[in-house]
Structure formats: C-alpha cells, structure tokens
C-alpha cells in the first residue's frame, strides 16, 4: 500500500463536509 492518494484525500474532505453542510442547512431553516 502506498501513501494516501489524492483521491482518498478528496473523499475524506467530502465525508467531512457533508455533515457540516447538513448542519448549516438545518440552522438556516431554523433561523428563517
């Protein structure tokens, strides 16, 4: 196995961003 590839880095970023985006959308809906 080689070191972390660019694809794995992008996948990790997407996985980390999805919950943040969902939380942001929920917050904007609550504040309306």
From Swiss-Prot:
Positions of transmembrane segments: 9-28
Biological process annotations from GO: photosynthesis
Membrane topology note: Single-pass membrane protein
Keywords: Membrane, Photosynthesis, Photosystem I, Thylakoid, Transmembrane, Transmembrane helix
Pfam assignment, any one: PsaM
Compartment(s) where it occurs, according to its Swiss-Prot or TrEMBL record: Cellular thylakoid membrane
Main location: membrane
InterPro entries named in the record: PSI_PsaM, PSI_PsaM_sf
Coiled coil start-end: none
Any one GO CC term of the record: photosystem I
Family the UniProt entry places it in: Belongs to the PsaM family.
HAMAP family to which the protein is assigned, alphabetical: PSI_PsaM
Protein name: Photosystem I reaction center subunit XII
Organism: Nostoc sp. (strain PCC 7120 / SAG 25.82 / UTEX 2576)
């Amino acid at each position: 196995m080689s070191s972390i590839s660019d694809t794995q880095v992008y996948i990790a970023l997407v996985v980390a961003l999805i919950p943040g985006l969902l939380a942001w959308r929920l917050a904007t809906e609550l504040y309306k």
